Amino acid sequence: MVTVGEVLKNKRKNLRRSLDLVSADTKIQKRFIKYIESNEFSPFESEVFLKGFIKIYAEYLGLDVKKILALYRKTH
């Protein structure tokens, strides 16, 4: 099964956007983007922050936020 991190990372790479650019544009720290793309969710203080970052990141990449959050809920 495809994960949220894989979908986001693949889309970012298809758009040829670096982690530094994504971080600068979204104001999400690079380390958090790496955690999300690696499906490492334990470093986040709360699920509210995690879901907020996923939403911002998905919107930035032009993905359907509802589908991405549903995928997150389905796999966690």
Q: Where do the model's predicted regions map?
A:
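Cytosolic/nucleoplasmic/matrix-facing N-terminal domains/tails
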Residues: 1-76
